[in-house]
């Protein structure tokens, strides 16, 4: 079972489906494409049994290193200014980590999943502004947020390799980025994703507890 992301597709217009060609426009996307192609080739040869589950950017308890982890949830939990990549006004699919785990377990238990790529179910895509609003509601106070621009990431990338990598993937956050998991739902569903409001509240609680331990 290979847990993958959506980097392989590159910039696309419309929802992301499994039948899109691999047209990665970035180094990270090209690496992911090569890994997936090699795994599927090994499956066809009978060397391995492989199924690939792809999710969008993730969040949830334990997700500090996510692109919306420490810089968004962590900062908000500590009362600091949070950062959102790209535009705040375009919809973006985000997968909740426990839902990703459930879906991967499902794929691992079903022989018909083998040899295929599957998109893992996520709750409805939200704009950055709406997502930050859910964090604020869970915290019970406003959250100050800055939309991080391409220019800002390029400047920061002179000193910070992580900022350079974020700049490379920023196209996902500058236009609608919508995951289509209907293939998974037709084959194995219904698997109902956790509603964002509930998932965000659980994630905020985890980051709050973590911040408390950090400052002890």
Predicted segments with their positions:
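Conserved Rossmann-fold NAD(P)-dependent oxidoreductase catalytic core, especially the SDR/UDP-sugar
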Residues: 1-31, 43, 51
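Conserved sequence/active-site signature of Rossmann-fold short-chain dehydrogenase/reductase
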Residues: 8, 58-60, 100
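Short-chain dehydrogenase/reductase
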Residues: 14, 18-21, 25-37, 66-70, ...
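A structural motif corresponding to the C-terminal end of an alpha-helix
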Residues: 35-49
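NAD(P)-dependent short-chain dehydrogenase/reductase
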Residues: 45, 49-52, 56-91
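Substrate-positioning beta->alpha
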Residues: 64-71, 85-108, 115-117
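Alpha-helical membrane-targeting segments
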Residues: 71-93, 144-177
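Mid/C-terminal beta-alpha module of Rossmann-like enzyme folds, strongest
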Residues: 103-165, 181, 186, 194-216
């Amino acid at each position: 079972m290979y847990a993958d992301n959506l980097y392989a597709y590159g910039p696309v217009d419309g929802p992301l489906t499994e039948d899109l060609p691999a047209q990665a426009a970035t180094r990270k996307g090209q690496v992911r494409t090569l890994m997936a192609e090699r795994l599927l080739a090994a499956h066809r040869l009978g060397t391995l049994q492989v199924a690939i589950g792809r999710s969008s950017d993730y969040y949830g308890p334990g997700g500090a290193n996510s692109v919306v982890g420490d810089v968004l949830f962590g900062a908000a939990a500590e009362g600091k200014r949070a950062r959102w990549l790209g535009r705040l006004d375009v919809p973006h699919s985000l997968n909740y980590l426990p839902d990703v785990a459930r879906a991967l377990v499902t794929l691992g238990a079903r022989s018909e999943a083998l040899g295929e790529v599957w998109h893992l179910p996520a709750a409805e895509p939200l704009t950055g502004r709406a997502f930050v609003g859910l964090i604020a509601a869970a915290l019970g106070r406003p959250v100050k947020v800055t939309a991080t621009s391409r220019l800002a990431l390029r400047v920061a990338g002179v000193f910070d390799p992580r900022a350079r990598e974020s700049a490379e993937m920023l196209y996902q956050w500058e236009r609608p980025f919508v995951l289509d998991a209907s293939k998974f739902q037709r084959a194995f569903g219904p698997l109902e994703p956790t509603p964002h409001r509930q998932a965000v509240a659980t994630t905020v609680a985890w980051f709050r507890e973590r911040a408390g331990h950090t400052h002890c």
